[in-house]
A protein has these predicted regions:
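Conserved G1/Walker A P-loop phosphate-binding module
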Residues: 2-101, 105-107
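Conserved glycine(s) of the Walker
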Residues: 42, 215, 307
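Conserved, well-folded catalytic cores of nucleic-acid-processing
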Residues: 53, 72-76, 91, 106-113, ...
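Conserved C-terminal guanine-recognition region of P-loop GTPase G domains, centered on the G4
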Residues: 77, 100-171, 200-204, 278-279
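Canonical P-loop GTPase G-domain recognition
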Residues: 140, 149-186, 190-240
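P-loop NTP-binding site
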Residues: 244-354
Length: 354
């Protein structure tokens, strides 16, 4: 099949799926970008900022993201499909293994890789493991040194050099950033000049801030330049492929992460039990929050039910904002001992709202 015939086929597929009101131009680009990094480096905040809509919940607590989350950015000249992924870590139980399979699936399916680090801190072995994990991939790779808004100006040179040293060939580690290659600046980027054999070897690296929006337009331009020519796969205005039940469950979990402390948030799962649109247009949602121990259930409910009410009230506002409708949210607390260690329960809790 010639290139022209392939383009025609792509357009026919997109039209059949109903993904556009008009044919996409011949120079239209589209593709998947896997967003990867260790936990708590701001991947979800960055994806939300790039998409321009909240498609993934955020929390300062690590391991907030448990599944691949698709964020769709549509422009006249391109459609970028960001795959927000769980933070890469050593799997110790069934939940962690599930999360790492989600990372591997995103890397397998993507057209480009965006490696995200937290430049406000010096890199550690977790960052190096992520770099090594993606080194074997043939797709174009980019480094986003994120959380630049939290970077102390006195630390810029040291921290940028340390993060770019993640990319240095093994034989040059310890010599400084890139073995003497030019460093990224706060205002711009640089093309990679690493020799063959680098651990990571990206096309570009850049300081970014998902919270403040630093350099996101430039980062996006770099990503777009490497994506293949192709059709629009989702209609304009659609920002994710996640359904409303999944999003509602995630908003409940986000508020639980926000208000609960210590180990309780890590053992939480949320399932939607009932969803009804009532004659007056109000949406009734019943959800169950699962924890692993009775003591955690008591903390989740709170004195006189205060904690559960607080989580519900804040989650309801997020759900109403997303749905554009009034919501009556009813929450229940239940105990499911050791669910994070049970493959079947992990799959049920993480996929049951899809």
């Amino acid at each position: 099949m010639s290139e022209g015939e392939r383009d025609d086929t792509d357009r026919l597929i997109a039209d059949f799926l109903g993904t556009g009101e008009e044919p996409t131009p011949a120079d239209h680009r589209s593709g998947y970008v896997a967003v990867v990094g260790k936990p708590n480096v701001g991947k979800s905040t960055l994806v939300n900022a790039l998409v321009g809509h909240k498609v993934a919940i955020i929390s300062p607590k690590p391991q907030t993201t448990r599944r691949r989350i698709l964020g769709i950015l549509t422009r006249p000249d391109a459609q970028v499909l960001f795959l927000d992924t769980p933070g890469v870590h050593e799997p110790k139980q069934a939940l962690h293994r599930y999360m790492m399979r989600e990372v591997d699936a995103a890397l397998k399916d993507c057209d480009a890789v965006l490696f995200v680090t937290d430049v406000s801190r010096l890199p550690n072995d977790e960052d190096r493991r992520v770099a090594q994990r993606i080194a074997r991939l043939s797709q174009p790779k980019f480094l986003a040194m994120n959380k630049a808004d939290l970077l102390d100006p006195r630390d810029v040179i040291e921290h940028v050099a340390a993060h770019e040293a993640l990319l240095a060939p093994a034989s040059q580690e310890g010599r400084g950033a890139m073995g003497g290659a030019p460093r990224a600046s706060e205002a711009g980027s640089r093309e990679s000049v690493e020799p063959a054999g680098s651990i990571f070897n990206p096309q570009f690296s850049m300081l970014t801030s998902g919270t403040r929006g630093d350099n996101l337009d430039k980062l996006l331009s770099m990503l777009l330049a490497t994506l293949p020519y192709g059709p629009r796969y989702f209609p304009p205005g659609q920002t994710t492929d996640q359904n409303e039940r999944f999003l509602a469950a995630e908003f409940v979990r986000e508020q639980a992460l926000r208000f609960l402390e210590q180990e309780v948030p890590h053992g939480i799962a949320v399932t939607i039990e009932d969803w009804q649109t009532r004659p007056n247009g109000m949406i009734y949602i019943a959800a169950t929050i699962y924890v692993e121990r009775e003591s955690q259930k008591g903390i989740l409910i709170g004195k006189g039910g205060d904690m559960l009410k607080k989580i519900g009230a804040n989650a309801r506002k997020e759900i109403e904002r997303e749905l554009g409708a009034k919501v009556y949210l009813e929450l229940w607390a239940k105990v499911r001992p050791g669910w994070r260690r049970d493959d079947a329960l992990v799959a049920r809790f993480l996929e049951g709202n899809s």
